[in-house]
Amino acid sequence: MKFLQIIPVLLSLTSTTLAQSFCSSASHSGQSVKETGNKVGTIGGVGYELWADSGNNSATFYSDGSFSCTFQNAGDYLCRSGLSFDSTKTPSQIGRMKADFKLVKQNISNVGYSYVGVYGWTRSPLVEYYIVDNWLSPSPPGDWVGNKKHGSFTIDGAQYTVYENTRTGPSIDGNTTFKQYFSIRQQARDCGTIDISAHFDQWEKLGMTMGKLHEAKVLGEAGNGNGGVSGTADFPYAKVYIGDGNGGGASPAPAGGAPAGGAPAGNDQPQGPQGQQPPQGQQPPQGQQPPQGQQPPQGQQPPQGNDQQGQQPPQGQQPPQGNDQHQGQHPPQPQGPQGGNPGGSDFNNWSQGGSPWGGNQGGSPWGGNQGGNPWGGNQGGSPWGGNQGGSPWGQGNQGGNPWGGNQGGSPWGGNQGGNPWGGNQWGAPQNAAAPQSAAAPQNASDGGNCASLWGQCGGQGYNGPSCCSEGSCKPINEYFHQCQK
């Protein structure tokens, strides 16, 4: 009897050891691609994105999911990747979800605000959520990220402060009212496993209802309204996956994969209706401001994934004007009142009375400028509003960008072939589509574009490559098949 009681303990210890093995042994491996400009793409079935508003920047992405990001004199810079879904399944229907990451900071300087963690959306109800486990700035995001502080809770063995907002403004479903949820880790960590589902569970206990999952992505961002952000954020290990898996890679789906009907990494993501605008960013509730001198500079929008209301960097730390940042990633602007914008959005180009994020005519740091402000009304490719130049977040794209004027429902941009982030040249899917709910013969020829080891290769609603460059395609559940040895 005692022996039988010991077995679960030993198994738990073994699982924990495996789950953290990447913290000591992880290193880049596989094929690699180096990007020196803004780019959304895939490598070995893993989706990736590099975006910056200025500076001399680069990023190297590997087919094993790892990546290394270098920025010099940037105003705002981000790397991100993860899973996309079709908003038809709840988190419980999809399965337990986690994200593994290892972060190595090198020569980081002049960072005013930063977020490293998990970001995404749900529908029915419409929710924008944020799990922050680390940051490249000297200080973590503060109470100004939310207008309702639920308090501190132990989630997956660590203390997180949970915030909630109710916002009216741009979202993946257009200009509307939606919820924003935040979990901010009280002690940053450079390596570990984020139990995404555990945060969902805690939020549900607090009455913070989750809807049908639209995405879950790993995000790393650094910015400063004064510019000059420099350093390297190296991620020798990064994966988002469904199921228990382990740190060594058992059953993880590569970042960018799309179980539950979503598109494969970097391919066609569910597109939203025309006219969808990017969700307003991380502005604090009206009247709630962080200390002066910590605001992002006018016209500078943080990269996508960070447009949570209330999450604005302290005054003086606004991103520079004219920065086209990706939807959803605005640095939290520490300004309270919304200004006079018709819909209350801080990040759009409709406000006429000083909204910090958009459309205001009186010096709003985030909008109304005519020279490329990513958040409002610019005519030169602003990702957030009415741009005509293919901005991933703007209203002129034709592929369904949920953030603006897209025609096909893509949550992130007007791409023509499914680029999840925008109407840019990266949108066309490169992978041959496999029949939904049926995986093609394993290791069959797919034009040389087969999924990598641990990549998605089939499942209900999946339309990406169905062959494996290594191993064979095995069903995990009806929505997700994966290349495994």
UniProtKB/Swiss-Prot annotation:
Q: Which pathway is recorded for this entry?
A: Glycan degradation; xylan degradation
Per the UniProt entry, the signal peptide is: 1-19
| MF (Gene Ontology) | cellulose binding; endo-1,4-beta-xylanase activity
Might you report a single GO cellular component term? extracellular region
Q: What is the protein's name according to its record?
A: Endo-1,4-beta-xylanase C
Question: According to its record, what is known about the domains?
Answer: The CBM1 domain is essential for optimal xylanase activity.
Provide the coiled-coil residue spans: none
Domain GH11, by residue range, is 34-234
Question: Which Enzyme Commission number(s) are on file for it?
Answer: 3.2.1.8
Broadest EC class assigned to this enzyme: hydrolase
Please state which protein family the record places this protein in. Belongs to the glycosyl hydrolase 11 (cellulase G) family.
Annotated region 8 X 9 AA tandem repeats of G-G-[SN]-P-W-G-G-N-Q: the residues are 353-425
Report the catalytic activity.
Endohydrolysis of (1->4)-beta-D-xylosidic linkages in xylans
- InterPro entries documented for this protein: CBD_sf, Cellulose-bd_dom_fun, ConA-like_dom_sf, GH11/12, GH11_AS_1, GH11_dom, Glyco_hydro_11
Tell me the segments the record calls region 7 X 6 AA tandem repeats of G-Q-Q-P-P-Q.
275-321
Which regions are annotated as sequence repeats? Answer: 275-280, 281-286, 287-292, 293-298, 299-304, 310-315, 316-321, 353-361, 362-370, 371-379, 380-388, 389-397, 399-407, 408-416, 417-425
Keyword Repeat carried by entry: yes
